[in-house]
């Protein structure tokens, strides 16, 4: 959460702080579950993976066998709110009126956003920040689950920061 007064008073983190979920937050989660249920086989039906996780050493044998932890399909790595966000962003990219080159660049931002918003991203206590999926090479289920705001302007892993990385890359390439 953010509090401008705390920011103006000089509190640590520029007025940002962790906030326990409120009743309204829980209602938003329920609303996201309902939205996902109503849209997943309608307008978003081709924007999410239904495939089972392929058998591989890192997913089925090493560390934690993901199917034994409840992760049987790619979509099980996301909660319903994340699935709505991801599928909606992906749909906007693939159905948009942009050129193929711009769509490919936007897909790069979607890929980065996926890394930062899933059930395997964590809060890194030592570094005091979100760490995206594949920060290391294991698929171990996480005990410090974190979720950020899709369109927030602060922090790592929101849509803005993921899209900015693509813009920076294109600018660098044009030098």
Predicted regions and their residues:
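Nucleic-acid modification enzymes, centered on SAM-dependent nucleic-acid methyltransferases
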Residues: 1-175
